[in-house]
């Protein structure tokens, strides 16, 4: 059964800021809280993102696969993700901007 990763994407502007679904390839070990590279938009330009959740699901046509994982382990835990969601609502920023404020530098 395919695994769907819900990702906050850096390239998403405020007007369409939401969580995007991507197919997690079977040979890719990506955990919640890991930074990833994803194809985004009609031109499939590569953008950084962070996995917020993983769920088993049905294979949907048109669902793009993750390109690669940037981290060996999660850089953000459940509390960090919850904080990013709160920051997004409170300070009118994109979800990825909120995530970037809590990630360690480097």
Segments (PLM) and residue ranges:
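Accessory, non-ATPase domains that flank or precede helicase/AAA+ motor cores in DNA-metabolism machines
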Residues: 1-106
